[in-house]
Amino acid sequence: MKRGLLLLLLYFSFLSAFAQQMDGELYNLAKTKSGYRSKRISSYDKSGYNGDRIVGIKPNEKVIICNIQGAGIINHIWFTIAPPPHLISRNDIILRIYWDENDYPSVESPIGPFFGQGWDESYNFSSYALTTGPANGTGMSTYFMMPFGKGARIEIENQADNVIDNIFFYVDYYEVDKLPKDMGRF
């Protein structure tokens, strides 16, 4: 009897030892963060119709995707582009990201390699901070944290010889009262 009680006590001790920690990542998802507001800028059609895209970016044309004022942290960017990669090279579409009202970009890269699709190829893959899919990697996402103190601007330049028919995008970010201490720049 004593042995059975001891085994039962040990069993419940092990259960509590291996239970989910109350300070883990899933627990922290449910916590509100004072001074943080979740925001999104996207290509949605403000008229309510289904024209959720930027249409017809001509060769050598630049388009501003977003211009955010104040402090914040971009936590997700998603793009999909038409025509597909075999008709317009993702190496000829340049992504530029500017921080804090700078005249020069901190990020300047062909959009394909920025999202992990080098060698002028498109394919599905998933990593911690980058993912592409579902159809031959045409949807491209990044989850890199990109803090900024005074503002952020993202632009696309078409350096291809043909028109970019459509660009669809999301830029998700936290608007913050003040950046956390010791935040660098991407």
Give the residues covered by each predicted segment:
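Bacterial Sec-dependent N-terminal signal peptides
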Residues: 1-21
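Beta-strand-centric surfaces of beta-sandwich/beta-rich domains
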Residues: 20-186
